[in-house]
Design a protein with these regions (language model features):
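Transmembrane-helix signature of polytopic, membrane-embedded enzymes
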Residues: 107-129
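Short periplasmic/luminal acceptor-recognition loop of GT-C membrane glycosyltransferases, typified by
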Residues: 367, 377-459, 468-481
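Short acidic/glycine- and proline-prone juxtamembrane loop motifs at membrane-interface regions
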Residues: 136-143
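Transmembrane-helix motifs of polytopic, lipid-linked glycan transferases
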Residues: 94-114
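Short hydrophobic/aromatic helix or loop-helix immediately within or flanking a transmembrane segment
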Residues: 45-52, 63-88
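Signature aromatic-anchored transmembrane alpha helix within multi-pass, membrane-resident enzymes
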Residues: 329, 333-358
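Hydrophobic/aromatic-rich transmembrane helices and adjacent perimembrane loops
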Residues: 310-338
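Transmembrane catalytic cores of multi-pass membrane glycosyltransferases
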Residues: 32-43, 54-56, 63, 71-72, ...
Length: 521
């Protein structure tokens, strides 16, 4: 078999090899009942609110939905479309499985189009799909980035085929699609398109007006999302921008690009990715000039972007692994090395993907088992209850932190209960908590506490319990609180407990008849 250049197709360029890589990419997500990513329970709670409040009077009396052109709707929209067929939890799992699948397909397509064939090194980039942002549960962003990679690969393909109407339409309409998935996915797509435009039109160090004009016109195809952005980011929806030039954090985000559970394994994996890019930069490996320019554009953006960008936190952390992935796609073995050396490199790349996938599968299975133990309390929560959850994560917090801070949202999905775990992000979420729940206990920011002896900024558990508005809630759920630190107040009646968590019914004091009658005499 030969490729489009008439060259023999090597085994690492075959459909079977690509299919194997795609299977390895989805393997970690197949076993857990729901993806064990940090923020996913809160996202699923939001999806449930957006789709199922008609049969949940407690939720419908507390939550409201404000439909607006938010650049944060990718997984929301897909789950909304799929939930009538399978329910919110299976729909969420299916959509999240699609994210690494689309990402891998996009990255491999980019590499193939940039090099004219799939290089033996391309698979080294795939483990970066399971990056820190993905483990954190930034699923709308991850979907936006996956679409950005896939559409950019198609743009390169149709530019090669000299079909300008098709690739321009892909950029124009693809920008809008990616924006609605997540605004920062659109930013990623923009970086890819800008780098590619520089490659196509800047042909010498002597920059002419014609070059500038061609680059600008190509980049203007990205501008369609500015229309909903103006509507969305007007008024009070501006969002915070802060922490410019936190240079010392930049290397940390690169080092933790694949942060999940094992600090040495994930740190060394990230360093391997950096080392591979370094081999290309110093000239030991061949580099695609096109993808090198895209990588440099992303690197410049990464250096200058702040931590918080128009209300989007961890902005620079999200870019780091994607930048590394493009850098790896830019490299390829030199033709002079021969097929044997290239085959050995492809085997090493496959081994790396397999090892990363197996490790992530084990990690996710452990998180899923841990979640099942934490959620044994759910049957004891009355359907339609109003629950205030207080979570005390381990102190100090290291590389591997139990993913429990958003587990209370599972009571929204499985018990139709209100829990104070939705995000308070004006202008970035459709769901808001109504006035029947005091704002100090309405959102996720109210849920985290610390135990005595823990030197962290969260409030002490005892202080937070004393502040609970008893009239607004009927249950208290403590997670990560050992028996020695649990409250013994008269107004808290134990309902369920184990060594790590406890559920209490909040006993409301009844007003005595004498008090109702008022003072005499």
């Amino acid at each position: 078999m030969t490729n489009r250049r008439g060259k023999r197709v090597n085994w690492w360029q075959s459909k079977a090899y690509v299919g194997l890589l795609l299977v390895l990419m989805i393997m970690p997500l197949l076993w857990p009942p729901f993806p064990p990513l940090d923020d996913v329970p809160t996202h699923m709670g939001r999806f449930y609110i957006q789709t199922g409040m008609a049969g949940a009077p407690t939720l419908s009396s507390i939550f409201s939905i404000d439909w607006m052109p938010v650049g944060n709707l990718g997984v929301d929209a897909l789950v909304y479309a799929l939930h009538p067929l399978m329910g919110v939890e299976p729909a969420t799992k299916l959509v999240i499985i699609l994210i690494p699948l689309l990402s891998a397909a996009g990255l491999l397509l980019i590499a193939r189009e940039a090099h004219g064939e799939l290089p033996a090194t391309a698979a080294f980039a795939l483990p970066l799909i399971y990056n820190y942002a993905f483990h954190y549960g930034f699923i709308n962003f991850s979907l936006g980035a996956a679409l950005a990679f896939l559409l950019f690969g198609l743009v390169l393909r149709y530019q090669r085929l000299k079909m300008p109407t098709v690739w321009r339409t892909l950029i124009l309409l693809g920008s809008l699609l990616i924006y609605f998935a997540h605004i920062f996915g659109w930013v990623v797509f923009g970086l890819l398109v800008v780098g590619n435009a520089l490659y196509r039109h800047v042909t010498s160090w002597k920059i002419s007006l014609a070059m500038v004009r061609a680059v600008v016109l190509e980049c203007l195809l990205l501008a369609l999302p500015l229309i909903p952005i103006v509507a969305w980011r007007s008024g009070d929806n501006q969002g915070e921008t802060s922490a410019f030039f936190a240079i010392f954090d930049k290397w940390g985000w690169i080092e933790s690009a694949m942060r999940d559970r094992w600090v040495k394994w994930e740190g060394l994996s990230a360093l391997l990715c950096v080392g591979l890019i370094g081999l290309g930069i110093v000239g030991l490996m061949r580099m695609s000039r096109r993808l090198l320019l895209v990588f440099l554009v992303m690197a410049a953006f990464y250096i200058f972007i702040p931590y918080a960008f128009f209300g989007l936190i961890y902005a620079d952390m999200r870019i780091a692994p994607l930048m590394l992935a493009i850098g790896i796609l830019a490299i390829a073995p030199r033709p002079a090395w021969g097929r044997t050396a290239a085959s050995a490199i492809a085997l090493l790349a496959l081994a790396f993907v397999t090892a990363r996938s197996v490790a992530t599968t084990i990690s996710y299975a452990r998180y899923a088992d841990d979640h099942a133990r934490w959620l044994k309390v759910l049957p004891s929560i009355p359907r339609g209850a109003r629950v205030v959850a207080l979570v005390a994560p381990p102190c100090p917090r290291g590389w591997n932190v139990p993913r429990i801070i958003h587990l209370p949202s599972m009571a929204i999905i499985r018990r139709d209960a209100f829990v104070n775990d939705q995000f308070d992000m004006p202008g970035a979420q459709l769901v808001a908590v109504g006035p029947s729940i005091p704002r100090d206990f309405a959102y996720h920011s109210s849920a985290q506490v610390r135990l005595p002896g823990c030197d962290r900024p969260e409030p002490l558990l005892a202080d937070r319990i004393a502040q609970i508005p008893r009239g607004a809630f009927d249950h208290l759920w403590l997670l990560g609180v050992d028996p020695a630190n649990r409250p013994k107040a008269d107004w808290l009646r134990p309902v369920w407990s184990d060594e790590r968590s406890a559920l209490y019914a909040i006993v409301r004091q009844k007003t005595s008849s004498a008090a109702k009658a008022g003072p005499r005499g």
